[in-house]
UniProtKB/Swiss-Prot annotation:
It catalyses: ATP + H2O + 4 H(+)(in) = ADP + phosphate + 5 H(+)(out). It is a peripheral membrane protein. Its EC number is 7.1.2.2. Produces ATP from ADP in the presence of a proton gradient across the membrane. The catalytic sites are hosted primarily by the beta subunits. One of its GO terms (cellular component) is proton-transporting ATP synthase complex. InterPro entries: AAA+_ATPase (IPR003593), ATP-synt_VA_C (IPR055190), ATP_synth_F1_bsu (IPR005722), ATPase_a/bsu_AS (IPR020003), ATPase_alpha/beta_chains (IPR050053), ATPase_F1/V1/A1_a/bsu_N (IPR004100), ATPase_F1/V1/A1_a/bsu_N_sf (IPR036121), ATPase_F1/V1/A1_a/bsu_nucl-bd (IPR000194). It comes from Prochlorococcus marinus (strain MIT 9515). ATP binds at G164, G165, A166, G167, V168, G169, K170, T171. The gene is atpD. F-type ATPases have 2 components, CF(1) - the catalytic core - and CF(0) - the membrane proton channel. CF(1) has five subunits: alpha(3), beta(3), gamma(1), delta(1), epsilon(1). CF(0) has four main subunits: a(1), b(1), b'(1) and c(9-12). One of its GO terms (molecular function) is ATP hydrolysis activity. Belongs to the ATPase alpha/beta chains family. This is ATP synthase subunit beta. It comes from the Bacteria.
Length: 486
């Protein structure tokens, strides 16, 4: 396990000031809690209702006072209430018992399924793994999804940015990745819902149950743990829930020695919450009103997401770009940490091409001959140049029609349309909607299939045979079926 912050003996303090989610607490001389320690306040408000609140120490003010940020609403809190220093940072449950459950930032279950059956906990603030413990050789993480594995491969222990508007298939893609890592890699997933809508979190949970990612009958057979800090919660909770999810993922990597997928939706909300907390603590804002510690905050989270010699955490982070401005400090700082980007295009979704991953806009630092090999690299670049040429010809086709193109361009268009259709595939988690069995396509089969299309070996097969299939053998079988029905 990575080194954890030292703990100190619990002491009692008194709340002296409450301003929104920020509270000042006075402690006896020489008994001040350490920075990042959790304070616990358990009392009754004037109406006699119970108050149970956790806050995290952010500043030592002098005069035996500390300033802390609350992890839940401060309604009913009054001066004079007793606050206990827990002597350690916020800790969350870890291990197999977390699978199939939903937690808040404090690691408390919020799914009404009873207490978590584990005594194992870990603090959310920890050091990143030492350089000597890191796996430095880049290794491709096979997802079984053709378009990703061929054109924008993920790095094992890397970070991927997931870009896309509403309704283009982000959730289904996330579910499929969770399903595939469990079945093919024996890994598990952790989902961190950071500052998004409660409705979306509920929908995701229900869809996970529907698709079998969460097994409601036997939670131990589930493939994912969920950790939510929704947009109605105080900024402290939204700022820390990403670390709570990451801590659960680190346990699977470091103790169980598994490959883990960590989903963060949305990484921008993590930065936004940090900005709110920074302003509440009275720090001078930096560019565009963001916190002056923006780079450090993002780095502290991202540096813990990595491959070690024991296992890996591969992170897929949904990135909201405010006002579509890629130069905004929040997305710009995030981009510096990403190894790959998966861009979902509405135009492809409208054509019925699922997954709607844009083959020209999606990128990966792994797509280089020294990492993926010459064959993979050349195939990927040939596929992209064919699709790029097709894109350039679309205006001419729209105005003059296909017949006005040269023989060579007509052939390019024909192959590009087959490539576009072959980049689609049926998903396991979508079986209940499509009625088609899902397909996991091995990387070598993907490369071989696209090479055959590019070489013209499949020019005589009908276009629709390439739509929503797995490997090239299925294309041929589908083509035979189409021809026999004519």
């Amino acid at each position: 396990m990575v080194a954890t912050p030292s703990t100190s003996a619990p002491t009692k303090g008194v709340v002296r000031q409450v301003i929104g989610p920020v509270l000042d607490v006075e402690f006896p001389a020489g008994k001040l809690p350490k920075i990042l320690n959790a304070l616990r306040i358990e009392s009754k408000n004037p109406a006699g209702q119970d108050i149970a609140l956790t806050a995290e120490v952010q500043q030592l003010l002098g005069d035996h006072r500390v300033r802390a940020v609350a992890m839940s609403g401060t309604d009913g809190l009054v001066r004079g209430m007793e606050a206990t220093d827990t002597g350690a940072p916020i800790s969350v449950p870890v291990g197999e018992a977390t699978l199939g459950r939903i937690f808040n930032v404090l690691g408390e279950p919020v799914d009404e399924q009873g207490p978590v059956k584990t005594s194992d906990t870990a603090p959310i603030h920890r050091s990143a793994p030492k350089l000597t413990d890191l796996e430095t050789k880049p290794k491709v993480f096979e997802t079984g999804i053709k378009v990703i594995d061929l054109l924008a491969p993920y790095r094992q222990g890397g970070k991927v940015g997931l870009f896309g508007g509403a309704g283009v298939g982000k959730t289904v893609l996330i579910q499929e990745l969770i399903n595939n890592i469990a079945k093919e890699h024996g890994g598990v997933s952790v989902f961190g819902g950071v500052g998004e809508r409660t409705r979306e979190g509920n929908d995701l949970y229900e869809e996970f149950k529907e698709s079998g990612v969460i097994n409601a009958e036997d939670l131990s057979q589930s493939k994912v743990a969920l950790c939510f800090g929704q947009m109605n919660e105080p900024p402290g909770a939204r700022m820390r829930v990403g670390l709570s999810a990451l801590t659960m993922a680190e346990h699977f990597r470091d103790v169980n020695k598994q490959d883990v997928l960590l989903f963060v939706d949305n990484i921008f909300r993590f930065v936004q919450a940090g900005s709110e907390v920074s302003a509440l603590l009275g720090r001078m804002p930096s560019a565009v009103g963001y916190q002056p510690t923006l780079g450090t905050d993002v780095g502290a989270l991202q540096e813990r997401i990595t491959s070690t010699l024991e296992g890996s955490i591969t992170s897929i982070q949904a990135v909201y770009v405010p006002a579509d401005d890629l130069t905004d400090p929040a997305p710009a700082t995030t981009f510096a940490h990403l190894d790959a980007t998966t861009v979902l295009a509405r135009g492809l979704a409208a054509k019925g091409i699922y997954p709607a991953v844009d083959p020209l806009d999606s990128t990966s630092t792994m797509l280089q001959p020294s990492v993926v090999g010459d064959d993979h690299y050349k195939t990927a670049r040939a596929v992209q140049s064919t699709l790029q040429r097709y894109k350039e010809l679309q205006d001419i086709i729209a105005i003059l029609g296909l017949d006005e193109l040269s023989e060579e361009d007509r052939l390019t268009v024909s192959r590009a349309r087959k490539i576009e259709k072959f980049l689609s595939q049926p998903f396991f988690v979508a079986e209940i909607f499509t009625g088609m069995s899902g397909k996991y396509v091995k990387l070598e089969d993907t490369i071989a299939g696209f090479n055959m299309i590019l070489a013209g070996e499949l020019d005589d097969l009908p276009e629709q045979a390439f739509y929503l299939v797995g490997n090239i053998e299925e294309v041929k079988a589908k083509a035979d079926k189409i021809n026999s029905e004519k």
